[in-house]
Swiss-Prot record:
Residue ranges of coiled coil: none
Cellular location(s): Cytoplasm
Functional note: Acts as an anti-CsrA protein, binds CsrA and prevents it from repressing translation of its target genes, one of which is flagellin. Binds to flagellin and participates in the assembly of the flagellum.
Any single GO BP term: bacterial-type flagellum assembly
Subunit structure and binding partners: Interacts with translational regulator CsrA and flagellin(s).
Protein name according to UniProt: Flagellar assembly factor FliW
InterPro entries, A to Z: Flagellar_assembly_factor_FliW, Flagellar_assmbl_FliW_dom_sf
Lineage: Bacteria, Bacillati, Bacillota, Clostridia, Lachnospirales
HAMAP family (UniProt xref): FliW
Source taxon at top rank: Bacteria
Entry keywords, A to Z: Bacterial flagellum biogenesis, Chaperone, Cytoplasm, Translation regulation
Gene3D superfamilies hit by this protein: BH3618-like
Length: 156
């Protein structure tokens, strides 16, 4: 199927790439169908990806896997919050965090408090709130990206 996207224009999307969020996401409860788009050639070459709504073209959120910005992100999430994901196993769960990218990139943050949890086996997703106060809504990530780039360039 062909879909319109906010940042990539019209693209061809295979049906098996559609994710369903039964309850939508916070602030966009009516938008239930999404896909993940990658800036790079594939998902392995992209640090930042996009959670693109299929129900509202203008809704595309930059997302990142926690391992790119924080060590040991393993919040406790109540089982009842994950019921909509169906049968979950560690090997079929992927976690993403939203990024906030202001014009001053040094102030870029990610939201550790409200991750997206996706069951890759059945393509179901949900967004949850982590109760632990250690996980904040605005976690600075610019310096983390800088350090990562230095490591990849072999400077560290």
């Amino acid at each position: 199927m062909v879909i319109a996207t906010k940042h990539f224009g019209e693209i061809e999307l295979e049906e098996d790439k559609i994710l369903t969020f039964d309850h939508g996401i916070f602030g966009f409860e009516d938008c239930k169908r999404y896909t993940i788009l990658y800036d790079g050639e594939d998902e392995n070459s992209s640090v930042i990806s996009w959670l693109q709504s299929l129900d509202e073209v203008s809704l595309a959120l930059p997302i990142i896997q926690p391992s790119h910005v924080i060590d040991q992100y393993n919040p406790v999430i109540e089982d009842e919050l994950l019921v909509s994901l169906g049968d979950i196993k560690e090997e079929n769960i992927v976690v993403f965090l939203t990024l906030t990218v202001p014009s001053d990139l040094t102030k870029m943050t990610t939201n550790l408090k409200a991750p997206f949890i996706i069951n890759t086996a059945n393509k179901k997703g949900c967004q949850v709130v982590v109760e632990d106060p250690m996980f904040v809504v605005k976690y600075p990530v610019y310096e983390k990206f800088q350090n990562r780039a230095k490591k990849e360039d072999g400077e560290c």
